[in-house]
C-alpha cells in the first residue's frame, strides 16, 4: 500500500526513542507489504470513514488518513496514552 507522511509526523517520529523509531520502521515495511497483518492491528477508528490507526509495539500507535489514491497519509505517532487522549478529544 502506498503512503506519505506529514512533516509533523516526521517530527514526532524523530522525537521518539531510537528503539521505537526502529520498530516503527520495521512495522511500516510490514504494513506496506500486508496492511492486514495481525500484529499491526491496522483498523479504522470508530466513527470515522477515513482515519486509521496502526500498532507500533505494545505502547505506541500511529494515525493516518485515507487519501484519494487509496493510500494513507500518516499524520501522528506517539504513546498509547497520548493516543487514548487524542481519541477522547474528538
Region spans (language model):
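Hydrophobic residues in alpha-helical membrane-spanning segments
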Residues: 18, 36-39, 63
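Arg/Lys-rich, positively charged N-terminal/basic patches that mediate binding to nucleic acids
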Residues: 1-27
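Short, charge- and proline-biased low-complexity linear segments
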Residues: 25-27, 45-48, 80-81, 85
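Tryptophan-centered motif/residue detector
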Residues: 10, 28-31, 74-76
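Enriched for short, Lys/Arg-rich terminal
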Residues: 2-4, 56-90
